[in-house]
Amino acid sequence: MHKDIATPGRTKEILARYGFSFKKSLGQNFLIDTNILRKIVDAAGISGDTGAIEIGPGIGALTEQLARRAKKVVAFEIDSRLLPILADTLSAYDNVRIIHQDVLKADLHAVIAEEFAEVSDRMVVANLPYYVTTPIIMKLLTERLPIRGMVVMMQKEVADRLAAKPGTKDYGSLTIAVQYYTEAEVVMTVPRTVFMPQPNVDSAVIRLTKRSHPPVAVEDEEVFFQVVRASFAQRRKTLLNNLLNNLPDGKEKKEQIERALDAVGIDPRRRGETLDMAEFASLSNALMPLFRV
């Protein structure tokens, strides 16, 4: 068994050998605690039948733990300076493929079809770069990839938003988008002290398990998400105010919006954050006539 990458000493040694300096613009913070990495792999339920997709492998600390358990690991790395380091640190593992590409531009359906044809279980496992956490999560969800789900580390504040309940300060349009596609659960909080360099915030690991079908029935997903976003546009405003100001031609359609709210029994004076997903679904279905040209 090779010496783990994720220790302060080994990480420093690897970085010094390659003269690597962190790029703040890429949100590079490397984990230096093997125990936490193993817990992430455990939380993802990685087995010999799993194909794992990793985003931002850094110097390979998590990749190594995944490679020891998964059938195959495909990792997307945007920073070309890390490619020779990964080729070195992961040289003992023949089940790892590094793709030098921005995952936001990748055709993930094609990658999964090509790389994971022989695996029965597919999972995204990653320590996500903080500056692009939300776009990456939304890409993975909206593209409806053939995966079981994802276990990802992110800023604690964002993880709390993904797993939030209605009526709380963290609950918002991102919460609903994520929980429409998955069941969200914060697995653990990770202190900032186990990273190099140390970030300014604590992190959390969240498990998003893909739902076989959405928990609510909506006539049109695009309209549903548009209504949700409009309802949270200004948190201190009432639902009616937000809908009038943020739906297309909302002000001209005040009567229709009021009728729709009345039809589904939602008080127009409520705030968006008090509505649960089922209420948003009924409301967006009732507002469908506004979106028909």
From Swiss-Prot:
Keyword Iron tagged: no
Pfam families according to UniProt: RrnaAD
Record-annotated disulphide pairs: none
Group of enzyme by EC: transferase
Transmembrane segments: none
Signal peptide (from-to): none
UniProt xrefs under Gene3D superfamilies: Ribosomal RNA adenine dimethylase-like, domain 2 (1.10.8.100), Vaccinia Virus protein VP39 (3.40.50.150)
CC terms in the record's Gene Ontology section: cytosol
Subcellular locations according to the entry: Cytoplasm
GO MF annotation terms: 16S rRNA (adenine(1518)-N(6)/adenine(1519)-N(6))-dimethyltransferase activity; RNA binding
Positions of S-adenosyl-L-methionine binding: 29, 31, 56, 77, 102, 127
SUPFAM superfamilies: S-adenosyl-L-methionine-dependent methyltransferases (SSF53335)
InterPro entries the record matches: KsgA/Erm, rRNA_Ade_diMease-like_C, rRNA_Ade_Mease_Trfase_CS, rRNA_Ade_methylase_Trfase_N, rRNA_adenine_dimethylase, SAM-dependent_MTases_sf
Enzyme Commission number(s) from the entry: 2.1.1.182
Its job: Specifically dimethylates two adjacent adenosines (A1518 and A1519) in the loop of a conserved hairpin near the 3'-end of 16S rRNA in the 30S particle. May play a critical role in biogenesis of 30S subunits.
Similarity section: Belongs to the class I-like SAM-binding methyltransferase superfamily. rRNA adenine N(6)-methyltransferase family. RsmA subfamily.
Protein name: Ribosomal RNA small subunit methyltransferase A
Source organism: Geobacillus thermodenitrificans (strain NG80-2)
Phylogenetic placement of the source organism: Bacteria, Bacillati, Bacillota, Bacilli, Bacillales
